[in-house]
Amino acid sequence: MNKIKFLDKTLVQKIAAGEAIDRPCSILRELLDNAIDSGADKIEVFIEEGGIRRILITDNGSGISKEDLKICYLPHTTSKINEEKDLERIQTLGFRGEALSSIAICSNLMITSSITGENSYQIEIENGIEKYFKKQSAINGTMVDVTNLFHNFPARKRFLKKDSIETKMCLKVFEEKAVTHPGIDFKLSVNKELKKVYFKESLADRVQSVYGEIIENNKFGKIEAEYDHVKMKIFFTPPNFSRKDRRNIKIFVNRRPIEEKSLSESIINGHSRILTYKNFPVCYLFLEIDTTHVDFNIHPQKKEVRFFNLPFLPKQISNNINEFFDREKQEILQDYHNVIIKRQLTNDAHLLHPENDLTNSNFKTYEITQDEDLILDKPKNNKVTNIIEDKVKFEGQISQKYKPSFKQHIQKIFIKTSKMPNNFQKSTQTNEFKYMGQLFSEFLIVENANEIYFIDQHALHEKIIYQTLINSEKTIQKLLVPIEFQVECEDTDKILTSELEEYKKIDIIVKKIQNQTYRLESIPNICNKYENIIIQFFKTRKSKIIDSLETELYATLACRQAIKCNDTISLEFSQFLINEFFNLKLKHCPHGRKIYHKITKFELEKSVNRQ
């Protein structure tokens, strides 16, 4: 009797499905790949109960014809490749023809689709078997609805995490697809609540939108490079935003997230001179590689990759990052030298006022080259552009020819409130603290008794402005010319409409003219000249505020008007901020972030073994 036998067809499909689909986020990844490959520029995702109960994706892509819809769920059916040679030049995210068949085996699957100008059709598959196929109301693109995941795989279902954890995994996949496709509008709803919205933007802006919350003030550095068969973009944070694990090192090759140890190690090596042991950088690497030099067909979920004839790549990544920080270090030292000279030559200690010239623009550009034999210690030919995005946006930039008085400067920052605070004076330094100076154009260093404070100048100034706004006497001010504006997102439109009466309570009159179109008619007097910020606040509404609209709005205004990182401020204004810090005992900015970090003399002495 033969011991070896052919497996049942259904069992074979279940085994294959288990390799490609192991949890809800795997389904989401495959369906997003299909939507992106369809040429869609708008994709919406709906998740319920961590994706276990339901994952619904709609797109406005090219759609599926009636004939293709009838067979799209069968194993190894695909429109992406035709022959073996196609595996060497894969341009799409999907290509194996396994995704829909695997999903159909382990869930209930319903697909509705149409090609432009043709009727829509719907097919439902249960446990891999077609349940029905019918004509459907016309839609633009494709809708894929997956329900009851693993209902026929009880063993696999038992190993799923609780809904909240599965939701986080789905969110991670959603963000990875969104960040690598900035030319697509993405929208995510979880349990019928809108969670994420990303509109079309540049890659740099999309990185800020998706990952900007990891660091304060969205301060990313950027390197761009191009070599034979490779285009490279690296986004990274300053050294002070290091992490204790590697989770924020992300690598994308041809718009796919991958796990490649050699590349992650090259990123870590590039930061080795600026990060201490067991600290890891926050870094996002984007590579576009000629398809003949890369193979994704080595892992069921395409998480691994094999490179051909690119031995220089890891070293190049490391060298570029190292050289970037070497140049930054030299600039910091030079800037420090310039500041010392300016302190000696100026009486009023106004330092480094922003100017509209290249030296103070928002981007610093460097060029590196690559030598011919690909030994990359000192590249020579191809250009690398390093950009540091300071995002300094000071209301009314000041030229050197005109320097306003201190009082004028403060009045502008404090939005011309009706009464200036009593401590807006050219006061000398108090005896309670000793101001040591400004660090990295970001922190104020203060000695107080036996303690040293590192105070975040932006967070502190933001809190002071916020309290001034909240506590000021307000009157309603009618705009001479009402401002009309539109919101692009339907969910934002619904939220804004529901909040119109709440805005009236804080002296903001905004009326809805028609669908997604509004008119701003009145604002509080203290918000004079900041209509644009208020309108931007309206346009970015993503969820209803639980606590207070007034709190959220004034926190936004304060954040936009406060001094930023890399703003060098006068000695007098620094002392004013520090006085307010100690007098008001401020601890957190309006958004909840800590304002300062404190080190005691004992802790400092202990760190150098003096205790």
UniProtKB/Swiss-Prot annotation:
Question: Which molecular function terms from Gene Ontology are attached?
Answer: ATP binding; ATP hydrolysis activity; ATP-dependent DNA damage sensor activity; mismatched DNA binding
Keyword tags:
DNA damage, DNA repair
Q: Which GO terms describe its cellular component?
A: mismatch repair complex
Q: Which terms does the UniProt entry file under GO BP?
A: mismatch repair
What the entry lists under InterPro entries is as follows: DNA_mismatch_repair_CS, DNA_mismatch_repair_MutL, DNA_mismatch_S5_2-like, HATPase_C_sf, MutL/Mlh/PMS, MutL/Mlh/Pms-like, MutL_C, MutL_C_dimsub
Looking up Gene3D superfamilies in the UniProt record yields: 3.30.230.10, Histidine kinase-like ATPase, C-terminal domain, MutL, C-terminal domain, dimerisation subdomain, MutL, C-terminal domain, regulatory subdomain
| Top-level division of the source organism's lineage | Bacteria
SMART domains attached to this UniProt entry:
DNA_mis_repair (SM01340), MutL_C (SM00853)
What the entry lists under PANTHER family is as follows: DNA MISMATCH REPAIR PROTEIN MLH, PMS, MUTL, DNA MISMATCH REPAIR PROTEIN MLH1
Report the sequence similarity comment from the record: Belongs to the DNA mismatch repair MutL/HexB family.
Q: What does this protein do?
A: This protein is involved in the repair of mismatches in DNA. It is required for dam-dependent methyl-directed DNA mismatch repair. May act as a 'molecular matchmaker', a protein that promotes the formation of a stable complex between two or more DNA-binding proteins in an ATP-dependent manner without itself being part of a final effector complex.
Q: What is this protein called?
A: DNA mismatch repair protein MutL
The record lists the organism as Borrelia recurrentis (strain A1)
**Coding gene?**
mutL
